[in-house]
Amino acid sequence: MITKIIYIKEGYKKDFVILDAAMNDLMRPALYSAYHKILPSKKTKGISKKSYEFVGPICESTDRFSIISKFQKLEEKDLIIIRDVGAYGMSLSSNYNVRPKPIEIL
């Protein structure tokens, strides 16, 4: 799954990366704490590492994907790859909170 960073909220020990993807697009982490590897779409050179919590824009405590420490520095509008979302991504997706289902390209 490819998603875009819409906002980065600075925190005390970690920053919150708000993505345009949400729990309605990928329900597995919210449903049963499934882990999906998160990667930047572009690797940056340098040693600048940060701690991030990757979350969706829905105001739900379960709308979160992962917490990663020592991730490369990110900026708003960067693209993020969420790996191994599987064949059941679309069937588990919903229109929760009046959000459209994700676009699926085969």
Where are these regions (language model features)?
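Charged (often Lys/Glu-rich) extended helix/loop segments that serve as interaction or gating elements
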Residues: 1-106
